[in-house]
């Protein structure tokens, strides 16, 4: 049975709480690093022309979906008994390597190839007889598309002046993404998307210097630039109701150098 948007309100609230927690975590780590190490770390990662590392990451991702004009115009009758099509945020994780080229003390070029494990969830809500908020009469079908993605981000990293054993940074760039699953296999899913994309990525984080390594947490926002929708093989009940699908994600990275 369909609920009255309680599920989606929970996701919205959860996102705000998660972001606030991450920001507090960043500040707490920075304070801990400075309090524990009175002397400035001499690890020297920032002085090397080329440096390397690895990272672990957790993300929440979804589709950005745009309805077609036919669905927005009730006179066409194409919508049938479908009330709404709602992408839902879902969690995943990724891991990869860091390759960093030093351009200046405050500017780096980063290549960070990674493998990501994604799940894209979409709810299709159908209309029913008039019900109540507690016992709605409509129904919901959930479509899940799992994907393993290879991502090749190329980013600029601008760093603030170092203060003791920490410094803030910003990242900006793009990423080429391709799905490891064949398109023929993806065509059997209810809501079908293509497997290649280019994303625009923006992030913010802190470098924290320890005695033998550098730890850098970062929050990064990613927005897909291509329309991934493939209506030819999508479920015919709603394939004409969608005009555009793009990926977006929010990722927490934990970098180690």
Name what the model sees in each region.
Residues 1-46:
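Cleavable N-terminal export/targeting peptides
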Residues 32-91, 257:
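Short glycine/proline- and aromatic-enriched beta-strand/turn motifs that initiate or cap beta-hairpins
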Residues 47, 104-106, 161-165, 209-213, ...:
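Outer-membrane beta-barrel channels and translocator barrels
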Residues 48-52, 89-93, 146-150, 166, ...:
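Residues that define the transmembrane beta-barrel architecture of outer-membrane proteins
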Residues 54-58, 93-101, 113-115, 152-158, ...:
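Residues on the lipid-exposed face of transmembrane beta-strands in outer-membrane beta-barrel proteins
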Residues 59-63, 116-120, 175-181, 222-226:
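Structural signature of outer-membrane beta-barrel domains
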Residues 66-86, 119-145, 181-193, 229-243:
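Flexible, solvent-exposed loop segments that connect beta-strands
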Residues 195-197, 205-257:
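Predominantly the C-terminal beta-signal and adjacent terminal strand-loop region
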